[in-house]
């Protein structure tokens, strides 16, 4: 199970329709092709999703919470998101997809709140939201008697 919003975001990734800064610049919605958060790197899809150090901190924290004995490199995360293939060390892929989908949604929302409304990209708040949202999806509801 994944939220409809997370599915929509993931669909945009899979079909190559992520609204990157260089595209937004071409249509007059941005003045720069640099990443809005780190302001030092050109924003391509890899950087937008996982390569930005600010966003990567969120990924590292959330994935470390749910998979403390595994390491996910930037390339590994990018491959999972763009091809829906995961490492053989993952024994429950649906669990991983929920974690990634929920975290992706939180980072996506944080990115656009920051970019459009000048709301600070608060990493720790996004980590908490991603963990809480993932646990909400993965924790079964108690059965009524």
Predicted segments, located by residue:
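Family-specific functional microsites
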Residues: 1-145
């Amino acid at each position: 199970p994944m939220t409809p919003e997370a599915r929509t975001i993931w669909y945009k990734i899979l079909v190559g329709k992520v609204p990157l800064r260089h595209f937004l610049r071409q249509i007059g919605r941005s003045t720069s092709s640099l990443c809005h958060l780190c302001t030092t790197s050109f924003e391509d899809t890899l950087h937008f999703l996982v390569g930005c150090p600010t966003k990567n901190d969120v990924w590292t924290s959330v994935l470390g919470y749910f998979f403390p004995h595994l390491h996910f490199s930037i390339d590994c995360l990018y491959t999972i998101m763009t091809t829906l293939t995961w490492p053989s060390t993952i024994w429950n892929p649906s669990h991983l997809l929920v974690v990634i989908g929920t975290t992706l949604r939180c980072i996506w929302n944080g990115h656009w709140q920051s970019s459009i409304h000048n709301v600070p990209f608060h990493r720790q708040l996004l980590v908490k939201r991603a963990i809480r949202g993932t646990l909400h999806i993965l924790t079964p509801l108690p059965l009524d008697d």
